[in-house]
Every structure is written in C-alpha cells, then in structure tokens.
Swiss-Prot record:
The keyword Cytoplasm applies. It is found in: Cytoplasm. Peptide chain release factor 1 directs the termination of translation in response to the peptide chain termination codons UAG and UAA. The modification N5-methylglutamine is found at residue 235. This is Peptide chain release factor 1. It comes from the Bacteria. One of its GO terms (molecular function) is translation release factor activity, codon specific. Pfam families: PCRF, RF-1. Methylated by PrmC. Methylation increases the termination efficiency of RF1.
Length: 358
C-alpha cells in the first residue's frame, strides 16, 4: 500500500478517536446540529478504521510468521501462516481502497426515472411499460416507493413517455447506471407473421434535488402554462385546467405534470422534475469530461449510448458496457436486477481504483 494512503488511514483513525471523545462529552447534545454532524461522521469513519485495524493486525501476523521461519521445527507452519497473512493483507488492501473511493454525494437520494419510447412505434411504447414494471418490481424488492409523476400512454397500452419517482435510501446508487438506450428484440403482439422486431427506449435516471436547494430556479426563466389533463388517446379526464407545463426558457427544457390531484400539486411536482433535470444536465456534463479523461464506459452520462439488449427468443439480457450476458430474461423483467447492478457498480469501482493508481 502506498505511504500516502497509509498516512490518510492513520489520519482517519486519529479523527475517529477525536470524534468519539467529543460525542462522549456531557455538553455534546447542547448543539444538536453539531451533534448530528459528529454522529454522521462517526458512522462514516468507523467501517474504514475497523478494516484498517484488521489490516495492521494481519501485517503483525505476517511479521511474527516471518520470524518463525528461522526455527526449523516451525518452518512449514510459518510458511502456511505467511501465505494466509499475505492473502488476508491483499483482500484488506483492496477493501480499504474501495472504502477510500470518493463518495457520490447523490448516492442516497431518491430518483426520478424517465422512460421514453424510441424507434419501434407501439411496440417501443409497450416495452417502455415493461421497463417501468421492471424498475417498479426492483423497487418493491428494496422496499422503495414508486409514484407515477407523469404519463403519456399509447393507444395499445404502454407509454410514449413516463416519469416515475422512486423514494428510498440508496435508490440513486443502485440505479444510476441504468441511463442510456435499452433495446428489445422480440415478436410483437401485433405481428401476425411471427417476425422478430427490434425496438428501443431511452432511460434517464436523475437524483431528486434537495428541496430545490441543489439548483437555483429564477422565476424569470420559467414559463408556466396550465391545461386540461387528458388520458390515453387524448380524452379529457377532468374539466379544470389542473395540468401544468413548465418551460425553462434558457435551456428549452419542458416538463408536464397532470397526474396530481390539483394544479398546485402538479406545479410542485413539475418544479421538482425540472430541478432534477437541470441538476442532472450539469452532472452529466462533468461526468462526460471525467469519463473522456479515463476512457470510461460506465457512468459517462451518455444517453445516446445503447447500453443493454433484451432478447426474448433467446431469453437473454446483455449489458454491452461490461460484456455481461445473463440467460434469465424472465427474472430480470420481474425486477431481479441485483446481478446486473452489482456488476456495474464493481466495474465502476475498478475504474475509480485504476484512476487512483495513476
């Protein structure tokens, strides 16, 4: 391990000792904001310091075993101990480097997930509905809540565009790599000749902005229109102008919300989506720059990139960024995304570790 990393770990150990001492003082709770800050810092430092302590213990075991090598009677035993200690040190070294990776400040946040039907017409819209169900089922498995914010349904079912809000700790950390182009290969329900068609949808995953604090919205930059909410096929579902359309004039971004119970609710939700989109645009610009520097395929924020193919005849899902193929399409479409998300997170961590080593 690099001396600079060891020095950093020692500083964190010293800081944990200091924070523990401060939390133990009688006056610690007199300033609750500071108390909460210290408690959070204690929780973040503890796992790193515990692994560092195990690392130092393994190094001590290695030194003891190497001393035993000079004793002929203990030589074989010492060799086994040295091998075990070196393996342990290697594992802990990797774990420590992962723990020291820069944290994404958005990882614990709720998300907005936008799914738009692309090439393929009605079949693409049906697939958009399938993707929404897949993410909803994944959210259920994690005990997260799903709220439909806005939906533009197609004639045959499915969605031309749908925006959902997923509420749950860590939602962004698990789903942030879902942004991009999703392609489906299957025989559509409307196909009488049994031919396989290829359709596509675009998915965008955005962290929810913190009470509009993450991004400043100047009222002069917004045009707010109201109109009557409508259902599938354009039929009006109420007689009041409760639906809201907000246009961000500097960027041309448009957000519509009509699923809320009132104009006020729709406006509030639309403002949240707009803030998330603007925040996301800034984040993607920074990510694209970083990704170009380290030639990264994961987390580049490129929405035009085709990231995954769902092949129904073969029961296959392939993530093209990491060359991962799973023959468990039914399970994946039912929300079993853990194997894919874990692999993407591991690859992203490997890229960050490689960058640390440069």
């Amino acid at each position: 391990m690099k001396p600079s990393i060891l020095e950093k770990l020692q500083q964190l150990s010293d800081r944990l000792e200091e924070v523990t001492h401060l939390l133990g003082q009688p006056e610690a709770t007199s300033d609750m904001d500071n108390y909460r800050k210290l408690t959070r810092e204690h929780a973040e430092l503890t796992p790193v310091v515990e692994v560092f302590q195990n690392y130092r213990l393994a190094q001590s075991d290695l030194a003891d075993a190497e001393e035993m090598l000079s004793d002929p009677e203990m030589k074989d035993f010492a060799a086994e101990e040295i091998e075990a200690a070196k393996a342990k040190i290697g594992e802990l070294d990797t774990e420590l480097q992962k723990l020291l990776l820069p944290k994404d400040a958005d990882d614990d946040k709720n998300i907005f997930i936008e799914i738009r039907a692309g090439t393929g017409g009605d079949e693409a819209a049906l697939f958009a509905g399938d993707l929404l169900r897949m993410y909803s089922r994944y959210a259920e498995r994690n005990r997260w809540q799903v709220e439909i914010v806005s939906a533009n349904e197609s004639e045959l079912g499915g969605y031309k565009e749908v925006i959902a809000r997923i509420v749950g700790l860590g939602a962004y950390s698990r789903l942030k790599f879902e942004s991009g182009g999703h392609r489906v290969q299957r025989v559509p329900a409307t196909e009488s000749q049994g031919r396989i068609h290829t359709s596509a949808c675009t998915v965008a995953v955005m962290p929810e902005a913190d009470e509009l604090e993450d991004i400043e919205l100047n009222p002069a930059d917004l045009r707010i229109d109201t109109f009557r909410a409508s259902g599938a096929g354009g039929q009006h579902i109420n007689k009041t102008d409760s639906a809201v359309r907000i246009t961000h004039l500097p960027t041309g971004m448009v957000v519509e919300c009509q699923d809320g119970r009132s104009q006020h609710a729709n406006k509030a939700q639309a403002m949240k989506v707009l803030a998330a989109r603007l925040n996301d645009a800034q984040k993607r610009e920074a990510q694209a720059k970083e990704a170009a520097e380290r030639k990264s395929l994961i987390g580049s924020g490129d929405r035009s990139e085709r990231i995954r193919t769902y092949n129904y005849p073969q029961g296959r899902v392939t993530d093209h960024r990491i060359n991962l193929t799973l023959h468990k399409l039914d399970f994946v479409m039912d929300g079993d995304l853990e194997e894919i998300t874990n692999a993407l997170i591991a690859e992203h961590q490997a890229e960050l570790l490689a960058a640390m080593g440069d």
